[in-house]
């Protein structure tokens, strides 16, 4: 954008904050982030947020992701967005898919099949929030998690002129997706049987894409 001086200032500030965050909040003995300076308690939220936003150094991603995955859906439907973002970012697609398809009382499956809603709720269940509404956008995280992470469609330049297609299907045997972009829809079809997988991508005529073939989940 031409703001070179401002970009340098922001970059320097980020490096300082990042370093301070690691020094104050990461416990190398626990191998995870604590809830704050001076405490040994390390909750799910203290770890899923840095995992989702790319604030975990590479050498600790595996341990932090393992801890986050082990906690399950121990957060609100609002927090579920960042929890699953973090798992997919860390390559733990099997854990992410398990949460997306769960039928526990903290799941979208519970909303649909047990409660009977046809819209995303404000909370997992009325027992957790008696005054919740039955039409709440913050409860609809799968609407963006599935196309971005499971199907793997990401714009890589302004206006979706270029894309990256990097599916993370985990154990799904197949999926068919039609992902809208400002330049037209992207069709992604995937099927796997045993050790054989087939991936088909159809792009709008005014775009190009880099295709990244699915790799085995980290938690295999």
Predicted regions and their residues:
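Catalytic cores of carbohydrate-active enzymes
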Residues: 1-131
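Non-catalytic C-terminal accessory modules of carbohydrate-active enzymes
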Residues: 11-12, 16-19, 94-220
């Amino acid at each position: 954008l031409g703001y070179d001086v401002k970009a340098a200032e922001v970059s320097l500030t980020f490096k300082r904050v990042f370093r301070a965050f690691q020094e104050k909040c990461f416990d190398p003995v626990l191998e995870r982030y604590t809830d704050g300076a001076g405490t040994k308690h390390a909750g799910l939220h203290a770890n899923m947020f840095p995992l989702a936003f790319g604030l975990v150094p590479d050498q600790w991603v595996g341990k932090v992701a393992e801890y986050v995955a082990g906690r399950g859906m121990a957060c609100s439907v609002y927090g579920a967005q960042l929890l699953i973002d973090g798992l997919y970012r860390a390559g733990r697609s099997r854990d992410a898919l398990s949460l997306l398809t769960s039928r526990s009382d903290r799941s979208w499956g519970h909303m649909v099949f047990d409660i009977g809603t046809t819209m995303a709720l404000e909370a997992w269940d009325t027992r957790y929030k008696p005054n919740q509404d039955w039409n709440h956008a913050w409860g609809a995280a799968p609407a963006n998690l599935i196309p971005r992470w499971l199907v793997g469609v990401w714009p890589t330049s302004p206006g979706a002129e270029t894309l990256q297609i990097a599916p993370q299907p985990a154990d799904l045997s197949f999926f068919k997706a039609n992902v809208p972009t400002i330049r037209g829809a992207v069709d992604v079809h995937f099927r796997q049987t045993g050790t054989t997988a087939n991936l088909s991508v159809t792009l709008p005529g005014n775009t190009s894409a880099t295709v990244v073939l699915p790799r085995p989940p980290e938690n295999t």
